[in-house]
């Protein structure tokens, strides 16, 4: 989905919705990260609920925070 080369993309599940469009996501490898919704998803009013499977982009500099770029159907 991303055109950036220096991001890590992983799949995960939403475990807890937080205020200000932030979410706690449990990744496939067992780690939990704090993630926010990407601007394009926000523009298109894509709803994310607890239990949804999502694609998360992680920066190699801070692996505890990420950006949700896709919600699987």
UniProtKB/Swiss-Prot annotation:
PROSITE patterns: S1_IF1_TYPE. Residues 1-73 form the S1-like domain. It is found in: Cytoplasm. Gene3D superfamilies: Nucleic acid-binding proteins (2.40.50.140). Disulfide bonds: none annotated. InterPro entries: NA-bd_OB-fold, RNA-binding_domain_S1_IF1, S1_domain, TIF_IF1. One of its GO terms (cellular component) is cytosol. The keyword RNA-binding applies. Component of the 30S ribosomal translation pre-initiation complex which assembles on the 30S ribosome in the order IF-2 and IF-3, IF-1 and N-formylmethionyl-tRNA(fMet); mRNA recruitment can occur at any time during PIC assembly. This is Translation initiation factor IF-1. It comes from Roseiflexus castenholzii (strain DSM 13941 / HLO8). The gene is infA.
């Amino acid at each position: 989905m991303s055109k950036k080369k220096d991001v890590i993309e992983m799949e995960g599940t939403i475990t807890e919705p937080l205020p200000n469009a932030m979410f706690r996501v449990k990744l496939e490898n067992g780690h939990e990260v704090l993630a926010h919704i990407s601007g394009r998803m926000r523009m298109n009013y894509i709803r994310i609920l607890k239990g949804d499977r999502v694609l998360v982009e992680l920066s190699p500099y801070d692996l505890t925070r990420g950006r949700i770029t896709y919600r699987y159907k």
